[in-house]
Amino acid sequence: RYAGTYQEDRLRNDWLLLLGQRRDWAQFAAFLPGYRMGDDHEVRCYALLIDEVEGRADARAADELRRHWYALREADDGCTQAASRFYADGKIRALDVWRKARLAVEANKPRAARNAVEIVAPEALPEARSMFESPSKYLLSFATTRGRLRQELVTLALVRLAASDVDNAARLLDAKWAGQLSPEERNWVWGAIGKQAALRLAPEALDYFANVTRERDLSDDMLAWQVRAALRAGQWKAVRQAIDAMSEDARRDSTWVYWKARALLAGRHVSDAERTQAHQLLESIAGPQGFYEQLALEELGQRVSVPPAPAPLTPEEKAAARANAALQRSLYAIALGLRGEGVREWNYATNLHTPGGMGERELLAAADLACERHVWDRCINTSERTRSVMDYRQRFPMPLQSLVVARSQAIGLDPAYVYGLIRQESRFVLDARSGVGAAGLMQIMPATARWTARKIGLTGFTPDQLADRDTNVTLGTAYLKLVLDSFDGSMLLAAAAYNAGPGRPRNWRNGPVLEGAIWAENVPFSETRDYVKKVLANTTNYAAVLTGQPQSLKARLGQVGPRSDAQAQTNADLP
């Protein structure tokens, strides 16, 4: 009855999971071909398990299993069962299973860690439980490893200890355990210790990483933090080496493409081959669409400009979007207040309903439909999926322009910065509310709003007024201005403070004076790190739209370092 709809595929996804849990492989195999979303790691693991049981798994199946299993942070049934079978059949190694346990321990996921240990060493579960509860006590309870199993448990204990006491983990590894672990285990633990030190912006992080004798033994996440620590220390050779050790998929990320190019160009004597390779890397990502894409553009001597507008949509293209039943159902659900359900159906209709998703012109037409209905988040996200053309009217809309621009200019804020922040905070969804209570266009916390209202003399304020767009913009811009002034006009630091609170970036700025991009890449919180990059890239694009002139992201990033003694701290009581 609902064939081809989001609802049908969502139900099929859940049904496949249930069939897998029941071990009803015949029904699972019958329903799997109609599953369009294909984004459930556990469903894919069940499919790989069936292939292995029936002798159809090819040479690539083990690699795919590892990828899905390692991507799951929480304990699951499908990938655990598949890993158990692949291990029993000799298709994956004991090391592959122990690595899953290490990743789970580092992520503080004890059940997922226990599931992995049970596959490879079920007799070790009681000892593993003791290790997880108190790694320091466990490591002090005996003097030698006495075999491979104990080596792996010591490795897990050191990884877990590093998350809470990095210096103690380093001391114990160096003084007691390093000689009793295999080179691979020792490298992994030093990688975990280095990562935890880098997360704390500790200057000794790079010294810990220097103990690694083979960087390819580390996970991509560890290598990413090795790159960040090396950037912070200005060690460009180490940047290059760590990126080269990453997996092929990781090296394709624009972050590491950019920093590899910078590392190639950073030496005292850059060869012609290095210069050519660096320029090829930069050209492969350069463009206006994102943080590192914009920085690559500037490294090539260009600035960020609004790209040419695509050809106008034809009446037929617009009509086809309006006639799309899934898009209309989505818009209707959003209008009824069922935003989550509506967003999921919209994404399914644009990405998955037809193989390969909608074409470029269809995406522009769907985005146009969302723009017309003022469903700005779907307008932006859909338009961002086009590659050969970019419609900046859709990607960087400016709702409430008279309000936002007037309010920003009245208090000395760059309207492009305000728009860049709103685009990231709420996607212009007026009734947006976060899980922690932030509300409205500028996602203001009630306590922050009350403090700001008192600060600017707004009397009679109550938190329910955050639903009013004028009040929300007034308080949001006022708070942003106070934050910006507190951080001496640094858009980068102010964006970090807006997301993570002012106390954290005050601490994060201490240390060496860094170029803004390096400081941003070293923000310890992944959410805030992603946030500041997007806000500043958004700001640069909005400035290009508002002024019609080429813009520089680098100029907005500036440099970040400790506050000088001559700079007085303003608004020290910022919430």
Q: What residue spans do the PLM features occupy?
A:
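Catalytic glycan-binding domains that act on GlcNAc-containing polysaccharides
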Residues: 175-179, 207-214, 220, 224, ...
